[in-house]
Swiss-Prot record:
It comes from Brucella canis (strain ATCC 23365 / NCTC 10854 / RM-666). This is Elongation factor P. Its main location: cytoplasm. One of its GO terms (cellular component) is cytoplasm. GO terms for molecular function: translation elongation factor activity. The keyword Cytoplasm applies. One of its GO terms (biological process) is peptide biosynthetic process.
Amino acid sequence: MKINGNEIRPGNVIEHEGGLWVAVKTNAVKPGKGGAYNQVELKNLINGTKLNERFRAAETVERVRLEQKDFSFLYEQGEALIFMDTETYEQLELQKDFVGDRAAFLQDGMMVTVELYEEKPIGIRLPDQVTLAITEADPVVKGQTAASSYKPAVLENGIRILVPPFIASGERVIVDTNELTYISRA
């Protein structure tokens, strides 16, 4: 579907320079002299490179519609992650580097959304929050009120986050998977 350059919004996926790009940030600019344009920060969906582009209102770009399917995480097999389509029960195998650092958050039966373009997976979205147990937490230093009131802790999947001082080892906490931050106790 063709759209004008000034209609690009954050989250839109467009075809540009032979690749698929997602708009991360957009800024409509109206200079005193010359025509208005849309300054867009793009991120390549395949290799993650970033690009800043200007699109005039008169330019048209191809907006791509991605198919989004729900999959359930089954298991890990070496460097491969195995998912199952919840509608057709077909299995999908993705490499760990496709998911990136967030692969550590995958748990058996976890529902994820896989973005497909022409039946080929190009992106994956994990739940925004997961519940995990704390395996290690530093003891609280009494009277340390001038500094930040957070202490380092290690989750059951090996990821280090900062937690409030009242969180102890063995407790379950809710973690933001995008920012890798503590949200609350479970």
